[in-house]
Amino acid sequence: MRHRAPHLLPVLLCLLISSAGCAFPRIVVLRDPLTSEEHLNLGVTYEKQGEYENALKEYKRAAKDLPVAYLYMGNVHFQRGKLDEAEKLYKRSIEKDRANADAYNNLAWLYYVKGENLDEAEAFALRAIELNPSKNHIYQDTLEKIREKK
């Protein structure tokens, strides 16, 4: 019996080590299965349901490829009364996409609501009208309200 034990121990050790890897399977996600557009749409759904933190997480994921996601994040912060954060995000949206008329309009509206930077707000509203004349009625409303407040 004593002579068999030294030979049996290495065999048992090999079996134990090789079976340990099989006993605990690991799931490794190499990349995000959702596209940026899907993250944006999921964020919109969360936002509509009032789940703002989840919406922000999804917009943040979408922002890697879609600059418009910064606009959406700004809108969430605006709705929650976090105007300084909304302002930063609207500016970031404009920085990333200078042709985003909605970002200019929303920043103009934010300044209107805060009652500050009204000259700049007017310029932003005019820029929105220039960039997207098809939404002139929306942007014109912003512009008129700003001019009334000045």
Which functions belong to the PLM regions below?
Residues 40, 47, 78, 112-113:
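Position-specific recognition of the canonical hydrophobic site in helix A of tetratricopeptide repeat
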Residues 44, 75, 109-110, 145:
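Residue-level recognition of tetratricopeptide repeat
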Residues 36, 67-71, 101-102, 136-137:
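Helix-start (N-cap) detector for alpha-helical repeat units in TPR-like alpha-solenoids
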Residues 41, 72, 106, 141-142:
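Canonical tetratricopeptide repeat
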Residues 49, 80, 114-115, 150:
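Structural motif corresponding to the intra-repeat A-B loop/turn of tetratricopeptide repeats
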Residues 31, 62-65, 96, 130-131:
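Structural marker of alpha-solenoid helical repeat scaffolds
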